[in-house]
């Protein structure tokens, strides 16, 4: 997928990502809003980078950006928060970082909240409940190719679902914490519903980095996972539509 915005091919920001990755969705939306030319390769960086002769970044995350290094080659870089700051230094137009220091700090906290806490909602609702896990197990492999043969889809679904369900502990999701995570998600939606009645973005009339962080997670919570989608439609239709607007 290529987006040409009056710039040459060599000036495009390159990245590798996945439709089911909330951080990929966060950064693609940010690039589009900031009108930064980009070229995205949909796939797995652990497969794509070696084929390009590039070293894997540490840690290996989605999305993976490719930036020029000191030698004139390309280097794989991850972690969306510092990448946002790097992009600001490269292109200051349509900034997503508030100029006021106090607002900038609040925006940073909101971005961190989205990246580190709202992602717990996403992973919990994606894999904790059997219906949701079955849904994600089917859809996520297809995001890499809707023409995936049925027998291969079945194999990948089983492997991916077992692996991800076994990793629920990483975000602190289990039968004991499930009601706590659910209650937190519902409070978040209620707060968003009240807030969006007053203004269209978290800090005013245009989005900051925090908006894009929340958006990334909500693309999955509102758009993919059946349980969280139903809760969102019930408690905060404004958040549902805000996710589409973003």
Question: Model-predicted segments: where are they?
Answer:
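GST-like fold's C-terminal all-alpha helical module
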Residues: 120-245
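Short secondary-structure boundary/capping segments
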Residues: 1, 55, 227-231
